[in-house]
From Swiss-Prot:
Assembly and binders: Heterododecamer (2C3:3R2) of six catalytic PyrB chains organized as two trimers (C3), and six regulatory PyrI chains organized as three dimers (R2).
Protein name: Aspartate carbamoyltransferase catalytic subunit
Xref: PROSITE patterns: CARBAMOYLTRANSFERASE
Family statement: Belongs to the aspartate/ornithine carbamoyltransferase superfamily. ATCase family.
């Protein structure tokens, strides 16, 4: 396998299971390597050979559009043989356990497995059973490390830094793996983090993660450099956490009036998929302060960087 990226960064981990456990040097190295791939992806020839001869399996137990397609594009641009396995094609639907699925896949000697699962900790369980490297593409409400990395890259490219910025994360924090990974990363990189949500959508003891807490948008967005909106994850809700979508939007949905509570040059982010008219309106989502489309672009570059960094640790690298 030959590497084509200029950076000599090597991630000191066999897997990427979460932001927790990464050092500031790890995060910075991945962001710097991602910058190289941002430039590559804007060229006509986007191909590199750093994963040539390697097999990448995308194992998605939850439906995904952005993340799965982004990992597929990332692997193919680096020259990997990429296989996608979705919920409908997995033998777990026939009663096979996750451990048996892992052992079956391991017998085929994949080099990199990218996995999404509805259960927190499922990706770590898989990682203990396979010989290749494993990337967490989201596990329950636990972590989504590549989303946090692409968000950090987007912020750094637009604000020039992460240190000292105030990032307001608004919405369904309780069920959000994106919020958790972003909180860990942003705190590590010196940003201030404020979570904004009704009490029913805040995890107990969230303050222990080193965040400020606000329960209304006026207080929550005051002085914010970045406003990061989260959707209501109804698929993870077992009861009624909000009275109605319309009432939720009235109090916590981001529109121009509420955005004015933040700094005049504040930028808006959303990990997707968006529920327009629930947590964000179209004028803001499509407006000049929105970075939402840029986040999607950064996702491919970040996932290329992660795949390459892990591949450099493989025995045949």
């Amino acid at each position: 396998m030959t590497s084509s990226a200029k950076s000599s960064f090597v991630l000191g981990h066999r897997h990427l299971l979460g932001i927790e456990g990464l050092s500031v040097a790890d995060i910075t190295g991945l962001l710097d390597l991602s910058e190289e791939y941002v430039e590559l992806n804007r060229q006509v020839d986007k191909k590199r050979t750093s994963l040539r001869g390697l097999t990448q399996v995308n194992l998605f137990f939850e439906a995904s559009t952005r993340t799965q397609s982004s990992f597929e594009i990332a692997g193919k641009r680096l020259g990997a043989d990429v296989m996608n396995m979705s919920v409908s094609s997995l033998s777990t639907r026939k009663g096979e356990t996750l451990v048996d699925t892992a052992m079956t896949l391991n017998a085929m000697h994949p080099d990199i497995l990218v996995m999404r699962h509805s259960a927190s900790g499922a990706v770590e369980l898989l990682a203990r059973k396979v010989d290749g490297s494993v990337v967490n593409a989201g596990d329950g409400a636990h972590e989504h490390p590549t989303q946090a990395l692409l968000d950090a890259l987007t912020i750094r490219r637009n604000k020039g830094r992460l240190d000292g910025l105030l990032v307001a994360i608004c919405g369904d924090v309780l069920h959000s793996r994106v919020a958790r990974s972003n909180i860990i990363l942003l705190n590590a990189m010196g940003a201030r983090v404020r979570v904004v949500a009704p009490s029913t959508l805040l995890p107990p003891g969230i303050e222990r993660m080193g965040v400020e807490v606000a329960r209304d948008m006026r207080e929550g967005l005051d002085g914010a450099d970045i406003v990061m909106m989260l959707r209501l994850q109804r698929e993870r809700m077992s009861g009624s956490f909000v009275p109605s979508s319309s009432e939720y939007f009235h109090y916590f949905g981001l529109d121009q009036k509420k955005l004015a509570y933040a700094k005049p040059n504040a930028l808006v982010m959303h990990p997707g998929p968006m529920n327009r008219g629930v947590e964000i309106d179209s004028i803001v989502a499509d407006g000049t302060q929105s970075l939402i489309r840029e986040q999607v672009e950064m996702g491919v570059a970040v996932r290329m960087a992660v795949l390459e960094a892990l591949a450099r640790n493989l025995p045949n690298a």
